[in-house]
Amino acid sequence: GDRFKLWEEDWKIPIEHGSKQVMAENGGPGGLFHSLRIAPEIVKICDEISKICPDAFVFNYSNPMQRVCHAVTTKHPDLKFTGLCHEIASMERQLPTLMETDYSNIEIKAGGLNHFSILVDVKYKDSQKDGYPIIRKKFKDYYSKLINEHEGFSSDPGAERGLFFELYKMYGYLPITTDSHLGEYIQWAHCVVDQEAINDFYNNYKKKCLSFYDNVSYSTFFDKKNNEMNERIIPIIEAIIEDSNVEEEAVNVPNKNFIEHVPNNIVVEVPGILNKNGVSGVRLENYPSTFGTLLNNQAGTIELTTDAVLNKSKQSAYLALLADPVVDNSIEAQKLLDAMIDHQDKYLGYLK
């Protein structure tokens, strides 16, 4: 379907029903409707993979990452299925300036949910010195002036850092992403996010995507020398083929005690080990229980979204809305679900 038309419906129709969601791609009511459209199609693809080439390594880039991955890994637990996202690349851009060293001298451990993760540990490789003291010293000044560069668009200094600063102040850890994604998962986000900057980002991202084929050839865009997207799929495949046993900074896999505060089998974003067996998650020791409570708030709505997708259940979709921290009105939630199914019947009409 029309990605941006549907996205804007996911965003605006819930707001008409009282939702205070801020982005509507991965979390909140919009994240649910996005999931209900795209997850069934990816599950169908994986149904075929399981029949034709069950030992294949399968990588997903589609959002909403944790809900798509959870639906697939619930139905096909033996499939070698991994979610990938380039959001972690922000650390490579930012930490060298903050820590005054090359990124090759920095070791990080980050994790949480996709688009809702934090830098748990960071240190200098040469000295093994903790990197957080200097990050904390320079944090406010650096991020207040930081300009986000994305798809040829430059933001105002400090844009999309309202919730970002609030989370750092409250929990003491560096968020990996900015307000547009962080705000999708928190019921109080709407009162602190930089909504104007989120809107600017969305409008410029939409403009860039819709003019993509007018400005650059497909082959040029994906040429390795010119690709600034920091996608890691090729190095990951190489590491699997070569049985390298190297660590990847961020992969999305079902939780197996990698983050102790999140139920097992909920898909989490953690470091991963790459070898001939594929991708294996790495446990994040000392993950803060405080931030872990925010992750845990998402578990129920993720599980119910999967149930709605796999069982074509409208009731489960409704319960997924009620489980979402961003939803605070059960009557409007029912009206919203009915309105969205009616509005997007082509994609959501399977829910009975």
Whereabouts are the PLM-identified features?
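Rossmann-fold NAD(P)-binding glycine/threonine-rich loop
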Residues: 4-75
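Conserved aromatic-histidine-acidic binding/catalytic patches
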Residues: 30-37, 56-60, 79, 83, ...
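Rossmann-fold dinucleotide-binding core
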Residues: 52-53, 57-126
